[in-house]
Amino acid sequence: MTSTQSKPSIVFCHGLWADGSCFSKLIVPLQAEGYECIAAQYGLNTTAEDVALVKATIGRVSSPVILVGHSYGGSVITGAGTDDRVAGMVYI
């Protein structure tokens, strides 16, 4: 990525028994560095529904997008990672 290119957006996907707030200590400093960040908030109904919600979230941020998934969120980003706007995925 050259200095003329914009930074990727980052979409965080939480694991079971968690919510998007678990990423707050990461989001604040990343936003301070100029990254657009959003924590997807899904209801853990079915994986297909959660993937659909993350794909909709990808549509709300600037491209390209980096998906970050923790635990169950890794399954979700695997499903959502087929979107053409996804530049990479991080599993934690």
Language-model regions, residue ranges each:
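Short, conserved loop/helix-junction motifs that constitute active-site signature segments
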Residues: 3-5, 80-85
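Active-site catalytic motif of lipid deacylating hydrolases and related acyltransferases
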Residues: 5-62
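Active-site signature of alpha/beta-hydrolase-fold catalytic machinery across serine-
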Residues: 25, 79-80
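Generic preference for hydrophobic/aromatic residues in regular secondary structure cores
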Residues: 62, 77-79
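Gly/Ala-rich beta-loop-alpha elbow adjacent to hydrolase catalytic centers
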Residues: 68-73, 77
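A conserved short beta-strand
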Residues: 85-92
